[in-house]
Amino acid sequence: MSTLTVDNVTKTYGDVVALDSVSFEIENEFVVLLGESGAGKSTMLRCVNGLTHPTEGEIRLNGDPINGSRSDIGMIFQQHNLVDGVSAYMNALTGSLDRTSTVSSLLQQQNKETKERALEALQTVGLLEESHQRTSQMSGGQQQRVGIARALVQDPALLLADEPVASLDPSSAESVMDYLKKAASVHEVTALVSLHQVNIAAYFGERFIGLRDGEILFDVSPEKLTPGLVDDLYGNVETVGLATDNSDNSTVDTSDGTRYDTETGSDGTDEVDVIGRQVES
């Protein structure tokens, strides 16, 4: 597990203040960033990922300042950013590019450990049987799950996701979020996820940070995420009732029709046997 510390971070673009003295710490949690478009969620994630630098303040991962892009931070985007024309397996392998540096080495020189890690990541997101299917033939939800697998191949200490289900239908969105949370749990990764769908956020989040105009409006646990707080955050918009816990349900139907056991992490596939066959090939 890992600890992310955001210490008094301000980010400005000219006269525009995108983040204003933001501070929080996350350790071993699945945390959701909430807020309207333009609230600062994406800017916050870009600062954490090292894609942009704070104007003031500091961001640290396990005590080390984040000063640039790091291979131990996995990022999942709203747009899948997958490689066209290749399989889910090959797309998952691109998560190791920081270690291999070139596409040529990705295709020809991966060791068995890296190949196995890619297949295990696909198993985590319920796509092991589809590992050799071209991602262009997959649904949007399946493609996003490949994106999660790709991030896991990096073996990250921190997992970030920027509106990962914004373009998906409700059923696919719930499935992707379920696999994302499972991935963070199985791989023991601290996660920070930005969402605008309050119901989905309330169902999956373990903690909620509300951003408005670049400032933290609230930082609360699930039981304290009230409709009043949500109305304050989104300007008194009409919201559907917050999601309730259904942790007693041990199975869900994924977007590809698979009956998935959320407790055992199994879709009925013999993981060891399948991984063994595919790695050897």
Swiss-Prot record:
UniProt xrefs under Gene3D superfamilies: P-loop containing nucleotide triphosphate hydrolases (3.40.50.300)
Subunit structure: The complex is composed of two ATP-binding proteins (PhnC), two transmembrane proteins (PhnE) and a solute-binding protein (PhnD).
UniProt record similarity statement: Belongs to the ABC transporter superfamily. Phosphonates importer (TC 3.A.1.9.1) family.
Protein name, entry field: Phosphonates import ATP-binding protein PhnC 2
Domain of life: Archaea
Cell location: Cell membrane
UniProt cross-references to PROSITE patterns, sorted A to Z: ABC_TRANSPORTER_1 (PS00211), ABC_TRANSPORTER_2 (PS50893), PHNC (PS51249)
Gene name for this UniProt entry: phnC2
Pfam families with a match to the protein in the record: ABC_tran (PF00005)
Species this chain originates from: Haloquadratum walsbyi (strain DSM 16790 / HBSQ001)
GO cellular component: plasma membrane
Domain ABC transporter: 4-238
Catalysed reaction, written as an equation: phosphonate(out) + ATP + H2O = phosphonate(in) + ADP + phosphate + H(+)
A GO molecular-function annotation: ABC-type phosphonate transporter activity
Enzyme nomenclature, EC number: 7.3.2.2
Bilayer disposition of the protein: Peripheral membrane protein
Feature: compositional bias, Low complexity: 244-255
Keywords associated with the record: ATP-binding, Cell membrane, Membrane, Nucleotide-binding, Phosphonate transport, Translocase, Transport
Binding site for ATP: 35-42
Function noted in UniProt: Part of the ABC transporter complex PhnCDE involved in phosphonates import. Responsible for energy coupling to the transport system.
Region (Disordered): 243-281
UniProt cross-references to InterPro entries, sorted A to Z: AAA+_ATPase (IPR003593), ABC_transporter-like_ATP-bd (IPR003439), ABC_transporter-like_CS (IPR017871), ABC_transpr_PhnC (IPR012693), MetN_ABC_transporter-like (IPR050086), P-loop_NTPase (IPR027417), Sigma_54_int_dom_ATP-bd_1 (IPR025662)
